[in-house]
């Protein structure tokens, strides 16, 4: 995530503009997102590391797991949106997303559905990453905190996408 994000946060904010947002699994899922500055820092660390080029994969994130409910509340507040979070069971959200995707495919021009199964998966199930190996082998250190990243994203969103 970060300024210019076109993937997750803009879609979430588009739904949130209605004043309501479906809080899948009551927002209890814990996720660990990655600011674009940290992706760049990890790439630089990998290029400069003495680690052998053996094709290893490394987990990269901000290293700050947070419950979805808290992440959304912070994001909406920073973006100046008053949003009521409405708890929705996961299975109901998955089913509704499938219907939303089907209806979008049937519409002329196939507009993007407001709710997708991928989006439900992102906020409905815990997804955290252990960045220990990247820290130890590459010297990776996140350079942008979650708080700073959210603030930067919100400022950009308010001036460019809102």
Residue ranges and their predicted role:
Residues 39, 43, 60, 71, ...:
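Non-catalytic, hydrophobic alpha-helical segments
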Residues 12-17:
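C-terminal beta-strand-loop-alpha-helix "lid" module of Rossmann-like NAD(P)-dependent dehydrogenases
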Residues 46-113, 151-152:
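Mid/C-terminal beta-alpha module of Rossmann-like enzyme folds, strongest
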Residues 2, 24-29, 56-65, 76-79, ...:
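Glycine-rich Rossmann NAD(P)(H)-binding loop
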Residues 31-37, 63-66, 129, 144:
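Residue-level signal for the nucleotide or nucleotide-sugar donor/cofactor binding architecture
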Residues 5-11, 25-47, 55-56:
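Substrate-positioning beta->alpha
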Residues 36, 96-141:
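Conserved C-terminal active-site "lid" loop/helix of NAD(P)H-dependent oxidoreductases
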Residues 129-137, 141-162:
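Amphipathic terminal alpha-helices
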């Amino acid at each position: 995530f970060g300024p210019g994000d076109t993937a997750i946060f803009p879609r979430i904010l588009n739904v949130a503009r209605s004043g309501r947002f479906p809080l899948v699994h009551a927002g209890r899922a814990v996720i660990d997102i990655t600011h674009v500055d940290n992706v760049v820092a990890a790439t630089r660390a990998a290029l400069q590391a003495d680690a052998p080029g053996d094709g290893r994969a490394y987990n990269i994130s901000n290293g700050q797991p947070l419950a979805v409910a808290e992440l959304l509340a912070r994001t909406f507040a920073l973006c100046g949106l008053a949003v009521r979070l409405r708890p929705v069971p996961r299975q109901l959200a998955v089913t509704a997303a499938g219907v939303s995707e089907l209806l979008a495919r049937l519409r002329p021009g196939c507009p993007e559905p407001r709710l997708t199964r991928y989006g439900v998966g992102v906020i409905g199930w815990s997804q955290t990453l252990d960045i220990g190996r990247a820290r130890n082998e590459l010297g990776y250190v996140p350079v942008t905190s979650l708080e700073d990243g959210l603030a930067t994203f919100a400022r950009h969103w308010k001036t460019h996408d809102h």
